[in-house]
Amino acid sequence: MDITINPRLFYIMVFIPFFLISLAVHEFSHAYFAYRFGDNTAKNEGRLTLNPLKHLDLFGSIIIPAISLLSGFAVIGWAKPVPVNHHNFKNPVRDDIIVSTAGPISNLMLAVLFSILLNYLPSESRLINYLYMPFIFNIFLFYFNLLPIPPLDGSHVLNHLLPPHLKPIFISISRYSLIILMLLIYSPLWKYFLSLIEWTSNLLFAP
């Protein structure tokens, strides 16, 4: 009996493990550096691990990604945020900035790793089709998480860099962060964000 698998379904099945690993590496990086700087919160909650199951968020890691994949849209998703108590840090400002940027930087490192694999593969290799999406996804995670919109990692960095008199204003607008993010996505500015992802992907890998 001949069994054929829908190419799109197979593509999704291949991508899902890369998707979950990318999210797990991101959250593990936050947990690891927080632990190194004296905060055991994530470790005590079992988050100092690369096991994707420990970082899953039902809505952000399963439902939304599944809908976007099945609909043919760009993959959107997130993991359960790692709990961090910056009061446990020896140098709260410096350490929190490093912990916050560790996640996005880990995704950039994964993108570089994927680019090395892609560049070494023969141009006719079918593996390129399956590795290219996690490659792009990790570039997206790198830039997206650096956006200075709460609760994204970039907002932690900006909060530490703002003058004291502006911090209360920044904190007060955090309740509108989802609205701000949606306005950004549907604004003309979003095309510049996507252009940045395209520029980075072409820099690392030119098919």
Question: Residue spans of the language-model regions?
Answer:
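Hydrophobic transmembrane alpha-helices and their immediate loop junctions
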Residues: 1-207
